[in-house]
Amino acid sequence: MSNARPQAGEKLRDDEKVKHIPITIMPTEKAEMLRKPEWIKIRLPRTTDRIDHIKKTLRKNNLHSVCEEASCPNLAECFNHGTATFMILGDICTRRCPFCDVAHGKPLPPSAEEPVKLAKTIAEMQLKYVVITSVDRDDLRDGGAQHFVDCINAIREHSPTTKIEVLVPDFRGRMDKALEILKNGVPDVFNHNLETIPRLYRECRPGANYQWSLDLLKKFKEQHPDIPTKSGLMMGMGENKEEIAEVLKDLRAHNVEMLTLGQYLQPSKHHFPLKRYVHPTEFDELGVIAKEIGFTHAACGPMVRSSYHADKQAAGVEVK
């Protein structure tokens, strides 16, 4: 592929996606790949009927799930459980985070039909708890905030009893505008992931800012004190336990109540290299620390993801 700018709708993946970020990602050779330990287990269902049904429903309505786009290891379990995390605003991200498997490029304009299609799909599937996330849309003046509101309000209209969790981008350069817009469609849980420790931001989250993300969570909470705020991090990218504990303190200092900690799994040899597999006991220890410093919910375990059993997380059920 040439160095020409991608056309609208063109997806860049793997080496094409990460070759222009501030650091050089050298492909991880097969011999260098860390062997998965026995505790990294993907739970496969006995039948794929429900999984196939959800995929067909998404295709029929031209909808996307982050489960598929980000190659989540829990896809089979969650789809078979009848849950999905819907990804709005398309499937092309304006950022190039090297840990993430979502494609980069120039996104298409938001679909005006998506909010109603999404709401009708959720009603058809009779979902009681949904998570709505999005790609980063730095090309939009509001970062996509109005589209989030349109989706939330459409879901409320078609499924009044469905609980809605949003996992939002950082609204870089547009925080105040986005938060003002979000007042017109308030979710039941507000989630924004820090993803990693501040020392690794330049490598892992080019274009993002650690303090900005903390401030986004804090400002939302100040405006909506009754709505739980939530954040999550991946482990195994070069951080240590003490650095994670410091981030947990920062989150609590910014009034974040819910936490997820999970194992980073390298999507391909072109992505950010996995440095270690974190033992389940370390996740347990961090979960104890989280509760001790005031988190009301802490889902900590190798296979935990931000929206993994999000309904159970919100209900206070232990998730690992």
Swiss-Prot record:
Compartments reported by the entry: Cytoplasm
Similarity comment text for this entry: Belongs to the radical SAM superfamily. Lipoyl synthase family.
Name of encoding gene: lipA
InterPro entries assigned to the protein according to its UniProt record, in alphabetical order: Aldolase_TIM (IPR013785), Elp3/MiaA/NifB-like_rSAM (IPR006638), LIAS_N (IPR031691), Lipoyl_synth (IPR003698), rSAM (IPR007197)
NCBIfam families assigned: lipA (TIGR00510), PRK05481.1 (NF004019), PRK12928.1 (NF009544)
Protein name, per record: Lipoyl synthase
Stored Pfam families: LIAS_N (PF16881), Radical_SAM (PF04055)
HAMAP family in the cross-refs: Lipoyl_synth (MF_00206)
Binding-site residues for [4Fe-4S] cluster 2, renumbered to this chain: 93, 97, 100
